[in-house]
């Protein structure tokens, strides 16, 4: 697993601010088409985040599959108990099946910018290069949020390994 954090200037509401770009990547032993199919399921998000983050979707539940240009809102509970960030909004900016890229723009009261891009690249018939790239801005909390995100995305990629090893299926 590789992890990189870079500082970068980004636009936030017309102002140039200093944010971070976190990149977490690893090789995984799974067919890229199968990984792509799983990635589009909301159940996968809930599984890879559990127990570090539990979601309480506004309106009761997430859709079964994510859809491009769709917006969903949720409450996030750290470790299933502690509310964080108020309402967290995810806008599915891009779901590109050809290039296997899922990209969201996300925000809440703490993480003003949480832009997440997941890329899958085929290495062999049964292995992929999986990359999470997250651009983060949270004002004076940017460093703390980025440190937490680093731990969180490493954890998520380890949870992917459980999915692969146990061949976990999602509806």
Where are these regions (language model features)?
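Glycine-rich portal/gate segments that line the openings of hydrophobic small-molecule binding cavities
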Residues: 46-47, 56-106
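Short, highly charged C-terminal tails/helix-capping segments
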Residues: 57, 61, 162-171
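Beta-strand/loop substructures that line and gate deep hydrophobic ligand-binding cavities in soluble
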Residues: 103-151
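A non-catalytic, amphipathic alpha-helix used as a structural packing/dimerization or gating element
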Residues: 151-159
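A short, structured loop/turn motif at beta-sheet edges
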Residues: 31-33, 64, 93-100, 119-129
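Hydrophobic ligand-binding cavity/cleft-lining segments
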Residues: 1-67
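Generic short beta-strand segments
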Residues: 7, 72-77, 133-137
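Short, surface-exposed coil-to-beta transition loops
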Residues: 21-23, 84-90, 112-117
């Amino acid at each position: 697993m590789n992890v990189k954090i870079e500082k970068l200037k980004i636009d936030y509401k017309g102002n140039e601010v200093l944010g971070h770009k976190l990149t977490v990547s690893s090789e995984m032993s799974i067919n890229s088409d199968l990984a792509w199919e799983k990635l589009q399921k909301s159940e996968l998000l809930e599984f890879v985040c559990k127990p570090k983050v539990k979601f309480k979707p506004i309106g009761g539940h997430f859709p079964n599959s994510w859809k491009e240009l769709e917006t969903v809102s949720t409450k996030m509970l750290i470790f299933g108990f502690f509310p964080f960030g108020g309402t967290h909004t995810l806008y599915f900016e891009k779901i590109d099946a050809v290039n296997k890229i899922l990209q969201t723009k996300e925000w809440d009261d703490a993480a003003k910018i949480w832009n997440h891009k997941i890329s899958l690249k085929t290495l062999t018939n049964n292995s992929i290069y999986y990359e999470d790239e997250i651009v983060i801005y949270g004002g004076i909390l940017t460093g703390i949020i980025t440190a937490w995100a680093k731990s969180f995305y490493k954890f998520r990629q380890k949870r992917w390994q459980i999915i692969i090893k146990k061949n976990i299926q999602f509806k």
